[in-house]
């Protein structure tokens, strides 16, 4: 967690930039003048920034041979079958196993972020530079949000690729909403969200709005629901975050048993994958994204992780392909960035 007193906010809708400086007031007039000077310095840096590359967006699809995974296809399929056995035995209803992909990169990480913004625009876009570690993400999904004590979780479960025309999109959306497996999985995750909010909400305040509506993203169509509740006064915002983590869509149900199975089956720790990226404001509002469609960069090593929700009637081959599909946007962004040239 980082406490920052300086923000540069880019409004994508209005194409405007706001520079915000938090003033810790001791000498009001002097502190105000210093804040103005700091803002002016940032404006000069922004205007003089020439570190720009040309991105060739029309690059071919990523070559999977350039990527390695922490498990083979056969090992992933075996994990899916083990999860199905746990489900059949009544241990869990769903488990979300994942695999982690790795590639040596030879490009500026900022260009990967720029490419990802273009290829996979999402509600949550982030590039976090911690010197030795960089986090780049394009997440479609809210972990938890609080606005004026109203808590919101938006489960996303049920996915299908977009069509080439509006008519195809409509047909695919109908197909998605008629898929019994996808619907059952979504309803289960809505119930999880209700439970997560219910643990910290005022009694009787939890409700679902716009149940199972369709949302279209750049490459896929999702089924989405909105779950709300009024935060009880005795619970802090940190308790809200604690109850929301990890997201049911990244662990399974029941959460604790699903996480135990994931711990048993996955060969490496997840690190940021399935965690959260977001902010806490001084007025106690929060907004956190689930860390999916997210790359971690350590030096020249880039990692991206993706999984699939396993239920009783899951088809192992299909779930393996889903994990590849979910990682593909980051992989494509890397391909584009590596083909870029300096202007």
Kindly give the residue locations of the regions a language model identified.
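Extended alpha-helical targeting/anchoring segments
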Residues: 1-343
């Amino acid at each position: 967690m980082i406490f920052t007193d300086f923000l540069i906010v880019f409004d994508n809708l209005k194409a405007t930039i706001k520079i915000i400086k938090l003033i810790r007031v001791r000498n009001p007039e002097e502190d105000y003048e210093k804040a103005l000077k700091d803002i002016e310095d940032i404006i000069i840096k922004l205007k003089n920034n020439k570190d720009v590359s040309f991105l060739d967006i029309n690059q071919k699809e990523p070559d999977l041979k350039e990527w390695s995974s922490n498990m083979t296809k056969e090992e992933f399929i075996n994990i899916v079958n083990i999860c199905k056995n746990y489900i059949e035995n009544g241990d869990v209803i769903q488990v979300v196993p994942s695999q982690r992909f790795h590639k040596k990169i030879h490009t500026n990480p900022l260009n990967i972020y720029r490419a990802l913004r273009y290829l996979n625009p999402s509600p949550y876009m982030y590039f976090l530079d911690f010197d030795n570690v960089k986090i780049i993400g394009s997440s479609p999904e809210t972990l938890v949000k609080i606005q004026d004590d109203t808590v919101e979780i938006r489960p996303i479960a049920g996915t299908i690729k977009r069509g080439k025309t509006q008519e195809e999109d409509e047909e695919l959306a109908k197909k998605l909403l008629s898929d019994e497996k996808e619907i059952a999985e979504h309803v289960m995750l809505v119930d999880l969200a209700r439970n997560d909010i219910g643990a910290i909400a005022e009694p009787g305040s939890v409700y679902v709005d716009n149940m199972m509506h369709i949302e279209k993203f750049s490459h896929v169509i999702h089924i989405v629901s909105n779950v709300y509740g009024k935060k009880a006064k005795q619970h802090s915002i940190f308790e809200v975050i604690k109850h929301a983590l990890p997201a049911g869509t990244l662990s399974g149900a029941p959460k604790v048993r699903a996480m135990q199975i994931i711990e048993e089956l996955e060969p490496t720790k997840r690190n940021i994958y399935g965690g959260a990226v977001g902010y806490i404001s001084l007025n106690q509002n929060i907004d956190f994204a689930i860390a999916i469609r997210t790359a971690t960069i350590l030096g020249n090593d880039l990692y991206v992780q993706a999984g699939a929700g396993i239920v009783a009637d899951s088809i192992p081959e299909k779930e393996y392909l889903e994990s590849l599909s979910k990682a593909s946007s980051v992989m494509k962004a890397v391909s584009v960035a590596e083909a870029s040239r300096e202007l």
